[in-house]
Every structure is written in C-alpha cells, then in structure tokens.
Swiss-Prot record:
Residues 630-742 form the FAD-binding FR-type domain. This is Inducible nitrate reductase [NADH] 1. GO terms for molecular function: FAD binding; heme binding; molybdenum ion binding; molybdopterin cofactor binding; nitrate reductase (NADH) activity; nitrate reductase (NADPH) activity. It is an enzyme of class 1 (oxidoreductase). The gene is INR1. SUPFAM superfamilies: Cytochrome b5-like heme/steroid binding domain, E set domains, Ferredoxin reductase-like, C-terminal NADP-linked domain, Oxidoreductase molybdopterin-binding domain, Riboflavin synthase domain-like. It comes from the Eukaryota. InterPro entries: Cbr1-like_FAD-bd_dom, Cyt_B5-like_heme/steroid-bd, Cyt_B5-like_heme/steroid_sf, Cyt_B5_heme-BS, FAD-bd_FR_type, Flavoprot_Pyr_Nucl_cyt_Rdtase, FNR_nucleotide-bd, Ig_E-set. Heme binds at H548, H571.
Amino acid sequence: MAASVDNRQYGTHINAVVRACGPDFNTPLPSDFDLDSSSDDEDQNDDASFLKELIQKANAETEASLLDPRDEGTADQWIPRNASMVRFTGKHPFNGEGPLPRLMHHGFITPSPLRYVRNHGPVPKIKWDEWTVEVTGLVKRSTHFTMEKLMREFPHREFPATLVCAGNRRKEHNMVKQSIGFNWGAAGGSTSVWRGVPLRHVLKRCGILARMKGAMYVSFEGAEDLPGGGGSKYGTSVKREMAMDPSRDIILAFMQNGEPLAPDHGFPVRMIIPGFIGGRMVKWLKRIVVTEHECDSHYHYKDNRVLPSHVDAELANDEGWWYKPEYIINELNINSVITTPCHEEILPINSWTTQMPYFIRGYAYSGGGRKVTRVEVTLDGGGTWQVCTLDCPEKPNKYGKYWCWCFWSVEVEVLDLLGAREIAVRAWDEALNTQPEKLIWNVMGMMNNCWFRVKTNVCRPHKGEIGIVFEHPTQPGNQSGGWMAKEKHLEKSSESNPTLKKSVSSPFMNTTSKTYTMSEVRRHNNADSAWIIVHGHVYDWTRFLKDHPGGTDRILINAGTDCTEEFEAIHSDKAKQMLEDYRIGELTTTCYNSDSSSSNPSVHGRSDTIPLTPIKEVITPMRSVALIPREKIPCKLISKTSISHDVRLFRFGLPSDGLLMGLAVGKHIFLCVTVDEKLCMRAYTPTSSVHEVGYFDLVVKVYFKGVHPKFPNGGIMSQHLDSLPIGSVLDVKGPLGHIEYTGRGNFLVHGKPRFATRLAMLAGGTGITPIYQVVQAILKDPEDCTEMHVVYANRTEDDILLKEELDEWAKKYDRLKVWYVIQESIREGWEYSVGFITESILTEHIPNASPDTLALTCGPPPMIQFAVQPNLEKLGYDTQNNLLVF
C-alpha cells in the first residue's frame, strides 16, 4: 500500500462528512489537553488523510442498508441492515457476519454494515441527548456523563483496530462435536476506525482509588435487559492495571469509520479494548463500576471461556468450571484464514492457467498488540512451508503495539495445486506464538485457531475440461457445504462401509456418492416422496413417515428443505444416528460454466467483481389464515397472566388482526426461540378456540431451575417464555400433528377417517391441552353428541391445569365427565383419586371397549407406557387401532 495507517491522537475527526444525528462531532478540544502524541503535525495529517481515503472508499462501495423483512415483527424492525449478512440465530436476536469474499474485497477497512454483529437481545432504542454513562464504585466522585460532556471535556483518540469474536471459526468446532454456541464462520472479525475518549482519563477525572484500597477491577455494563441468569444486563470487566495502561488504547468510542456508531454496533457509546476479544467490548455502555472483584454478570462467567476439552456443559455447571479465573478469555490468539481460493471456486486447468502462477491470499491477526511477523502456507500437510508476503498497512502506536489484521499472499504453481490434497496456513506473531495443527475442542467453541485448511478436488466443469474445485472447511450459519460436514457424515458411514472409508482419504471428489441440486430436493416435499437436507446431506425419509413418533406432519413440514438447525434443535443423539440409514446423497451447487459468460469468476484471486444475490419481486398472496406450512411466522406477545406460581396464560397476536390461525382441532404448533445462542423448539397446543381471529392463547407450566432434582436447569422454553416482556416476538411454525378432529365424532388419523360416539380421554400434566382442544370443539357444536370421559393425572392439586374450565363444562354439559388423579394430596377434602391411573379407576370412569369407542391420550411417555396402555388392554381396548396418542 502507498502509506501506513498510524495510531495517533487527533483534535478533530478524519472524515468531514458525518450523517446528521444531532451531536457535533467536529468539536475542537481545549488547548490545555496533553495530546499524548509523539508525532509531528505533518505525519499526523498524512495518516488522517490516508484513513479518510480508506473510509470513503469503503463507504462508497457499499450498498445502502435497508429495513430487512426478516426483522418485521421483532423489536429490531426499525434498524436498517445489509441484506448480504449471514444470520445465525433465525430472526431474533440478530447475530451474523458478512460474506468473507466481500470483506476481502473491501480490504483493510471494513464498511460498518458488513462488520460482524453479536447481539444477546433486542437493540436498545436510544436518544443521544438523553443518554448518560455512570462512573461509580471505588472512585472519589461518582459521576453521570452526558454524551456532550464526554465529547467536550476529554481528549479524543482515533485509530484503526480489528475486532474479532471469540467464536470466530466456531462452526469447525461444531462439525467435530456440537458446542453450546452457534455457527460462526471465518468472517467473525473486521477492522474499523474508532474514535472516542480514553478510559483512563475518565477514571482519573472521577478519582479512581488505589489498588491497596480495593480498586482491583473496572466493570462495564450495557443497557439491554437479557434473560441470562434469570435476568441481567450484559456486563464484563478488566483488571485495573489494564484499564489505566496508556499503551492499551482503551476508549469509550462514539464513532466508527467517521460516522456515529450504528445501533447494532453500540450507539451512542461502547467500549473498545484493542487486542481483546469482542466480548469484552460492551455496547450501549451505561455504567462503569470500579470494584474489588470481577464483574458478577451472568454473561461475564457463562460466556467467553476456554474450558478443558473433557468438560461439557453439564460438568461445567456441576463443578463450577465457569468460575475458575484461569479459563477466562481476554486477549485474542494468533489466527489466519485462507480467503482465496474462495469456497467452491473452480480453477480450470488449461494451457493458459498452467503458465501463470496462482496467488493464494488471506488474512491474519494476533492479540495483545503483538505484530504478525510471519505467515506460511503448505501444500503437503506440513512437510514443507512457503513463507508468504505480508501486507501490514498499520503503524504501531507509540508503545509499539499493533491492533489490526494484516493480509498475506503467496504465489504457487497451478500444477503443484493439481497434485495437492489440501492447502493449509499458519501464522506467527512477535512472541513466536503459532497455530496448532489440529483443532482443540472446547464446550463453548471458542478461540479456534488450528491450521485453516482448504481441500482441493478434481472436477470437470465443462465438456470434459479438467479443473480444481476448492472447498473450505465450513460455511457460516446454517448454510450447507464444506469438507468438514461431508467428512463428519462419511466417517460415520465408513465404520460399516470400507468403500466409503477409502473415499474419505482420497484427494479427489467422491464420485460414488449421488449429488442433488436444491431445486431437485424441493420437488420432494410430500408424503409420496419426502426428502430433507441436514448438514449438506440429502435424506429420503419417505419410508420412515409412518414410524415417526411425532407423526408424519413433523417430517412433511420440512420436506424439500434444508432443516439442519431444526433437526439439531429437537432430536436426540439416537435420532441423529438413525438418520444415516436414510442418506441418499449430497447437496451440490451449480458449477461455473465456461461458456455461459465472457467473464472468468475464478482464477487468480480476482476481486474486482463481487456477485450479489439478485433482488426478486415477491408477491404475497392474500390469505385468511396465518400458518403457512414449512414457514415460520412472527407472533407478538400481547398479554401474560399468572394463573398460579408456575402457570402462565400467554396471548400472542397473529401477524394480522384479521387472520385465523389456521390450526385444525387436534393439531399443534412449534414455538421457535434462540436461547443461549441455540435454536430451541417446543410443541404446544393452543387453548383458544380454532375460530378466534387475530390471536391464540397458550397455557404453559413454567419449570423453574432448582426445583426438580432430575432437571436442575428447569425448562429452557418455559423459563424463556416467562421472561419475555410484552411486545416480544417469537416464531411459530405449523400446523403439526397426525390427529385431526373434524367434528361430530369424526377424526382423521394419518389422513385416514375414524369415527367414535364415545371418547376415553386420558391426560397427564401439560398433556391436557390437546384433550382440552377437542373437548372445546365438541362442546361448541350443539349438534355434536360425542360422549367424553376425561381422566386427568397430575402430581398434586396445584399442578392441575384448566381445572376451573373443565369443571364448569362438566357441570353444564352432560356429555362431558371429568375425573382427576393425583399422586399425593396436599390439602384435606380431596374428593377424587390419589395414586396412579389404575385398572379400577379406568373401569369406573371411562366407557367399555367397543367398535365405536376411541381412546385419546397425551402425557409423559412413562404414564402412557406403564399406566394407560396396559390398563386399557385389560379392559379390552384394541390399543393398536383404537388408542390415539397425540
């Protein structure tokens, strides 16, 4: 590059064009400030001019951010975002990274809209003029600083710094073994120019106390209300000596790339701690507290740790590993990534390409201010290494520290690539730290910095022409693709198939495996042919439809789609092993066609053209029901009522007030939320009538942590629902279920008609809700004469859901009989059964077995297996044909 980027202190910011947002960012500094700079004015002006040029170039080449339809109905629907961002956690909260080729196209400075985003909850909606930052704790003068006061009364520093999430490259971890984090790719880092006021100046102004008086840590707290730990703010801390160290360049930043911070990046003010992981740089900064101990936030202890490989989440909770200080992450480690060749790039092998060198390129960074001093590439698995050329635009600060990534490149012969099985890269820093050859797994999937490997395979892109196709280890988020995903599943199959074992070790494409395009898979979306995609593999589940314990709908609602995230969210390890029996091939993407265009998209690291996803016109058909099979719909929490200490009635609004839900009687829905960075899906049956317009109701029992010894963490979904504020939005998917009541004694079971004049309805715990729904539908139709006999089992009286409604209906309608069974009575005067469901209870309270009698049941599997089914059989019920299990 023509110049280097310096790390200096400036009196006015480097970019004269600032978007209008209220404050004046060109405020001159008081003349008595020590600018703490060792450079002369000429050098300073040259550096500022160069930074301005880089920022203007980055901003000019980025399309405008827009309101994203994926945010509609969420608390973030007011925030413009770049449409190319790869999202990790569904609709909300927003977490994502920019496409890696686009980051490399922009180079040293990343446009703010393409910088990675890590949010734990909704983005606070903040006004500049109303915002204050409190500094308190072990200081002589606790103070609230307005934004204007911060800007006017302290010196400003402006410098470039690379921020990286500690989870960068985590998806590689998740391919080895699932961590508790979502799937970061290799674009979880980027460089911006940050402007703010030094933290040490603010702390000095407030009179920070000495270490001997207990001032050991400086904690930072954000503004957002989060569910973690039963409800908390995002907070973390650093040691006092770090906070006060002038060489660390720690600032309270209010500008990024010459503009005010974007909402996703912490507007109006955030922490910037160069050389540290992004998790220490609190956004929407609200409080700074000087303390004797580390920050006590849930997120300080339960995030950003590297625990030993044998420690899983359960062991970490049981033995307190989260609280051991030696495992906390602060400074970044050394890391490097190959960006050219990009994933699925094809290099044709012909007389022209073989006469020119191929340039392999990428980025590298280290932490703690350590300079990257060497990057090496190997084509033979580490036998020999080629030293790369480094492009380091940054100058060190006055203390010799480097805060930014650098770029590297090396030229290789194309014929050498043709004979290589893979390309791997490793970097070194000035402390002679380097990257390990193999991945070291940890439960949070943090700090992955093993050699970055790109596999090479021979392909025939067009008319017999030979080419090399390059494959990165993973693709970010829930995108399919990457050699690690393929090898993970091939290795499972190879245990019983020696042919597959051989193909895993081959440097060439596995041509024995059938491949399918996405368009081919989409056509198999019905009961006659139900295909799904999981981790890039195609499975035909048609023959499993009738055996699926959750009913055919749970497969059909995802048929013809990539359902990786949902499959992982709701299936056990046993189910994942069963999946292999149904694998029929791999998902492929359409290769480059050398005759289709005059442009060459592949060859020598060209980055002058970045293909963007075409904009398609979407015409939304008018509809009267909310639920759309295979799609998630956003629903807003309208009200929440506490029925008891652990039972809640939730009312959710449908996307439009005039819509019916579109859920048949007997069917259920999935609620989809993201909790602790993982998708959580649970099935619920609404208690509201299917005829209600604009909303639906759920009665939910909240399973709190620490109550039941077998489930010390409680219920993930129920606790999350209980923590939601009014106005929160979650996703709903459905309808699901194999049983549908169509009225007047008629059912459809797996699509086949059934009829009954009498129903034995056996429920346990929260399994009452589908029974309740059928009862409600029958009673609403005065011409439906179906007899209903409900036996409802619970632990105690307090656990009985919907008792008032059931009792009222039983008094009003002769065709409904209700009987309760509880394990133990906690009050005198209980007039129903105590114990478990027995033959004698059923003999007395349900109808005799007959051809026109059906038994319906829903509840815990042990209840159905050991109480309901055997006792019905004793009474002569044909449980194979006349017992319907929701």
